[in-house]
Amino acid sequence: LHPGTGAYYEMRDYYNRLTEEEIRGNPDMICAMSMLRSMTFEPEESEKWYEILKEYIRHMDRGDSDYRRVCGLQSYLEIGLPHRGTEGLAKKLPAVAKLLTSKTVALPEMSVTSNLPSLLRGGKDFSEWVPKDKGLYNTIRIPVEMVLGRYGVGLGDIALTESLLEKGEDVSGRFLSLTALQEELRARGTPEMEFVLAALLVRTLLTAGNTGKARDLLLQFRAEAVERGATRLLPNIDAMRCRLSLLDGGTFASVWFSELAPNEAVFYGMERYRYLTKVRCCIKHRQYHAALLLLGRMLDYTRRYARPLDMLETLILISICRYRMESDDWREHFASALELGWKYGYVAVFTREGAALLPLLERFDHRAVKPDYWEKILSGTVVQAGYYGQYLRPPDIPLTRLTQMETLILRLISQDKSNEEICALLDIKMPTAKTHVRNLFKKLKVSSRAEAQKAARRLGLV
């Protein structure tokens, strides 16, 4: 079992029914509890069980036939616990590789993707490695792939390409080598890594405005995942389909939002990709408070679990949400996003928001931002807005924003108030009321009060 398949979380009810005494007597259960508590947002409990495992090992006979395997469980937790981030990992992985080579430990199989379409922010967020990605590729690629076994096949090349893509660099020249990796992954790798590779190709195609090819590739991979029984990948594959649908105005996004979106009543970190997809749907449908509630939980999670790239995406979506709510604090959140993005050199996480982000860029005072960094973000966002002009645009949004008075009058019309009643309630004269109603009808593209009421409900204006 490993967190990549979600098995620990799926079996949480079983583990929670066990007594502490029962768990303490089994090193596999101790390891499972440490990982489970980390995954369920209880890092202190996770560390408690990690220490219990260390104590268990100290009391073992080194000649015990199970000693190597149990030591491997400790190494597994040291590498894989989600809440520990990546600090020291670049040194730890080669050290574990040496232990494997000398047969000092035996590691359980582990996934680095958590079923997500990313290596940079799979089981851990590797943002700290991004500024020095090429150097790390040359120094630790081989030991990392050794430690991860099947899950390490192609990892170095995929991770480097994703890092370059996130920094806004052109990765089309790496397509040939990545395509060749597909066959190697099918032969020696895992469906999880194949998903990351497919997602990387999809994102590259979308960056170039090629939605048709991107959709075909994603649907082809989905069909293969179903055929091979890799159904654990489907929730995140469908979340990616939803994001693609949001870009090109397809119908799948509405289906996903109403039928497949996750329920965050119990917050589960491994659902983060789907949570941020749901947030985009909420923003599109003007459900801003629902979006902010979920974004607030994501912000807390990303801070506590050292996930800079997920935090950056969260801050950008908060900025868009607050901007659409006409709150001035969007600038504060966006400034934080720019500061964090510049630290790691991230560009694509901004530019992918295209038409949804462009109005913010046009109104933000960017004098404190490095000019070359700002130019990369602005130019890339303009290109994406050109490809996907309808992205996150509310359904049938009026071309001109309603004034505060027009919004008040629309609400009163929705309550079946007459012009006379509107004049009395708002203390305005009849000609003024008629002018506002006429302008309101023009903006809503309607010709009667009944049509105005329907438009108000459809647009979420009342």
Feature-to-residue mapping (PLM):
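Extended alpha-helical scaffolding segments used for macromolecular assembly and cargo binding
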Residues: 1-29, 33
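Residue at a conserved register position within TPR or TPR-like alpha-solenoid repeats
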Residues: 2, 37, 82, 124-127, ...
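Structural motif corresponding to the intra-repeat A-B loop/turn of tetratricopeptide repeats
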Residues: 5, 40, 81-85, 167-168, ...
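Alpha-helical repeat scaffolds
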Residues: 10-17, 44-55, 86-101, 130-144, ...
